Regions:
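Single conserved hydrophobic/aromatic residue that forms the stacking wall/gate
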Residues: 1-15
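Sequence-pattern detector for short linear motifs
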Residues: 10-12, 25, 61, 328, ...
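Conserved, function-critical positions that sit in or immediately flank catalytic
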Residues: 185-387
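Beta-strand-connecting loop/turn residues
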Residues: 9, 151-152, 264-269
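Generic marker of residues within folded, mature protein domains
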Residues: 1-3, 136, 146, 251
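Tryptophan-rich substrate-binding surfaces of secreted polymer-degrading and adhesive proteins
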Residues: 14-224, 302-323, 342
Length: 387
């Protein structure tokens, strides 16, 4: 029993909250504000729709106004927040959205030396031993997607990585267009158009650090699960027979994948996907087994097969780009709510309250604005009048 308890403790220590679970939680959080049917009224939806409110509070001064205390995750802090709460405003489903890091496409003239920025390419296997060009050890930390000057978002499918340029090449041409096919620019980059951020969403959710993640239904419907878009020469090898080798099948659990290899000077100089196939969750190319390429004299060539996300590129942008954060945007308008928001008070605390009840009942609140002030407490030495 003691050994079992020890193993259980070790399992708890080693477990971690994965990014995929965080994305799932973010999606469920927003969906909870909508409920099973967004067309239902609050009365019909009842407890099936969460009521989330942003509150302001703490009208009294801190001991040091220029250095307020760091919030503490404790029951006492929780109680204090309720005690000094002033007003609340409801957060609707339309006020919340999943967001990802904002990564701008940068013109070469704005980069050091004017050479352009090297973006990471999408890979399914980043790790501490296989890092991105930026040094990232996992995909969601990599700079593998961009938003252009027209608020169009693209995923970098290939950045020029090769044995001679193991970290890829600078991007010098801004990706544009909304084609559902892979977009190749003259600098050798290959981009997948993901979606465009509408003006309204730009104004509401596009910040200096984050941007909304959305779905383009045309891109989503065109996505092919397990379709291979990219192969990368890991090692050129030597001693191979010069020529072009076509229709080379991909080994893996999918079907229909084919590539073409070009050998010059005994080394692999090009590897291109000619048919992406479908349903690949793993795949590989064994160069030395390609018919006629080596005849026993060539060796050392290696080609990586880049496995796409489940469902294909563009099928689930929140999962593909790492939408595990939620941005909430709601405005407190001057004196709104018929007095729910006093205009002559400062506030020093802001937070979220889930499913508050109407005062004196166990009925969920549903108003857009609420007053959270049930009483006013004066210090013993207070003098003056109160109306």
């Amino acid at each position: 029993p003691h050994d079992l308890a020890r193993r259980q403790r070790q399992m708890c220590i080693r477990d971690r909250l994965t990014d995929q679970f965080r994305i799932f939680t973010a999606e469920k959080f927003i969906k909870s504000l909508e409920g099973p049917d967004s067309t239902q009224s609050d009365i019909v939806a009842g407890a099936n729709r969460d009521r989330l409110y942003v509150f302001i509070g703490r009208p009294q001064e801190w001991d040091n106004e220029n250095n307020p205390p760091t919030p503490i995750d404790s029951f006492q802090e929780f109680s204090d927040s309720y005690d000094d709460m002033i007003s609340m405003k409801r957060v609707l489903a339309s006020d919340a959205i999943q967001v990802v890091r904002r990564i701008d496409w940068i013109p070469p003239e704005q980069t050091t030396g004017g050479l352009g920025y090297v973006y990471d390419m999408y890979r399914n296997d980043y790790s501490s031993s296989k890092t991105a060009s930026s040094g990232a050890t996992k995909l969601y930390d990599a700079d593998f997607y961009v938003v252009n000057s027209s608020y169009q978002v693209y995923k970098c499918i290939y950045n020029g990585t090769s044995p001679s340029d193991p970290n890829g090449k600078p991007s010098t041409i801004e990706p544009t267009g909304t084609s559902t096919s892979i977009i190749t620019t003259a600098d050798g980059y290959r981009w997948k158009y993901m979606y465009t951020i509408p003006v309204g969403q730009v104004l509401k959710f596009f910040s200096a650090d984050y941007m909304p993640v959305l779905i383009d239904t045309a891109v989503q419907s065109d996505a092919v699960g397990g379709e291979i878009d990219t192969v990368v020469i890991q090692s050129s090898g030597s001693g191979y027979n010069n020529g072009t080798y076509e229709n080379i099948p991909l080994r893996g659990d999918g079907t229909g994948g084919r590539i073409s290899i070009v050998v010059d000077g005994g080394r692999i100089v090009s590897a291109t996907v000619t048919s992406g196939g479908s349903n690949y969750s793993f795949g590989k190319i064994v160069v030395d087994e390609v018919n006629g390429i080596g005849s026993g004299t060539g060796s050392g060539g290696a080609i990586d097969v880049i496995i796409p996300p489940k469902g294909g590129h563009g099928s689930t942008p929140a999962i593909e780009l790492g939408g595990f954060r939620v941005m909430i945007n709601t405005k407190f308008t001057y004196s709104e709510g018929s007095g729910d928001f006093p205009t002559d008070n400062d506030y020093r605390r802001i937070g979220l309250v889930l499913n508050p009840f109407k005062y004196g009942t166990e009925e969920l609140a549903d108003a857009i604005t609420l007053s959270a002030s049930n009483a006013v407490i004066f210090s013993p030495d207070f003098t003056g009048s109160f109306n």
